[in-house]
């Protein structure tokens, strides 16, 4: 299994629709102002956060249970900047839609710009033949409110291609998050 380069990422995005919309270069400015970078890097792709967020709240005094998740645990928010309360959590989604080839597995890591501020981005791997918008998990580990910027980079996806095609892909087993469109809450 080997990591894939910028050339491979560009080819797969442009010829096979692996990432849509796709940015073939690295974008660091928008309208003359510096932003958290996104787009193709040497061995990965920096994804952007869309403007749809679900922010944890305790106003309804629910219990967080991954097997029986209560949607009242979140407040929906739409905007260019999301403020995550101290020691709290928010969900978002990528601006990019992914179609992962059968021979590929991805690993997604948070960007150091956010990590150095105590904001941790967690995303599980994109499995072979999974497709959809990626649900992003942001943890504010600080005692202060933290900003997340929509339309800017938030994490980097690394692509690994196996030397052997898997017997059963995510699509084959009817994965529960296949084709997800918006911010998707836990399912069992």
Swiss-Prot record:
Keywords: Hydrolase, Nucleotide metabolism, Nucleotide-binding. Transmembrane segments: none annotated. It catalyses: dCTP + H2O + H(+) = dUTP + NH4(+). GO terms for biological process: dUMP biosynthetic process; dUTP biosynthetic process; nucleobase-containing small molecule interconversion. It is an enzyme of class 3 (hydrolase). InterPro entries: dCTP_deaminase, dUTPase-like_sf, dUTPase_trimeric. Homotrimer. Catalyzes the deamination of dCTP to dUTP. This is dCTP deaminase.
């Amino acid at each position: 299994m080997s990591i894939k380069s910028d050339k491979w990422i560009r080819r797969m995005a442009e010829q096979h629709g692996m990432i849509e919309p796709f940015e073939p270069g690295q974008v660091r400015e928008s309208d003359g102002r510096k932003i958290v970078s996104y787009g193709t890097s040497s061995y990965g792709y920096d994804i952007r956060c869309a403007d749809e967020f679900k922010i944890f709240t305790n106003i309804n005094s629910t219990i967080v249970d991954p097997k029986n998740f209560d949607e009242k645990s979140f407040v929906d928010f739409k905007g260019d900047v999301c403020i995550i309360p101290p020691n709290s959590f928010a969900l978002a989604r990528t601006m990019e839609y992914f179609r992962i080839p059968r021979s590929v597995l991805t690993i997604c890591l948070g960007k150091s710009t956010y990590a150095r501020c105590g904001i941790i981005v967690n995303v599980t791997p994109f499995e072979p033949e999974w497709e959809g918008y990626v649900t992003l998990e942001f943890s504010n580990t600080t005692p202060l409110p933290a900003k997340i910027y929509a339309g800017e980079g938030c994490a980097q996806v690394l692509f690994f291609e196996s030397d052997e095609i898997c017997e059963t892909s995510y699509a084959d087993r009817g994965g529960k998050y296949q084709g997800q469109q918006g911010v998707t809450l836990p399912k069992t």
